[in-house]
Regions:
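Post-HExxH zinc-binding segment in Zn-dependent metallohydrolases
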Residues: 1-45
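Pan-zinc metallopeptidase signature
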Residues: 27-173
Length: 173
């Protein structure tokens, strides 16, 4: 459930940031807020994907290897992927969901009794896993991954931080 909670936390952080970043005059205009929020979510989603790809690169893996099921890929993942934390949930899965946040919100609305609270049933967990698998196939996400993998592959000086969010509320207060 880490990825589920993390995505909601980032969406809420982005909503609050978007609201506070507007002048008092613009805060009463829903369309201005909505546009600001969408732009900030794009920034957050791209940052999230960048951070997840840095982790995979560090582990000598890539998105294709961890998402396309084949005997070779399973062996590669079993050999190279090691973690003692929840980095996979907090970074890799969360980045997929952040880059598909509109459908994530729709999924939550459809599959939960209360929007924010995950309905903890085996069937709902299976639906959540299927939703994540669908995110892996999203052409928009794959396109962004390809762009970022090329950038990371060409860059020797990759940022060493693993900040979960690039938008920080203290920067505007």
């Amino acid at each position: 459930y880490e990825s589920y909670c993390e995505v909601w936390a980032r969406i809420m952080n982005t909503m609050i940031y978007s609201y506070l970043s507007l002048s008092n005059k613009h805060r009463s205009h829903p369309e201005t807020f909505r546009n600001t929020f969408k732009e900030n979510m794009k920034i957050e989603a791209y940052h999230s994907l960048y951070q997840s790809l840095k982790i995979l690169t560090f582990m000598d893996l890539n998105f294709k290897v961890i998402t396309e099921k084949s005997k070779d890929n399973i062996e590669i993942c079993n050999h190279l992927y090691r973690e003692k934390t929840s980095v996979f949930s907090y970074y890799i899965i969360t980045s997929l969901l952040m880059n598909n946040y509109i459908n994530f919100l729709g999924w939550c609305s459809k599959n939960n009794n209360v929007l924010l609270q995950f309905k903890k049933t085996p069937g709902n967990l299976d639906k959540y896993i299927e939703f994540i698998k669908d995110c892996c196939k999203n052409p928009h996400i794959k396109k962004n991954i390809n762009k970022l993998e090329k950038i990371i592959g060409k860059t020797d000086n990759i940022s060493k931080n693993l900040k979960m969010t690039i938008i920080e509320i203290p920067n505007i207060i």
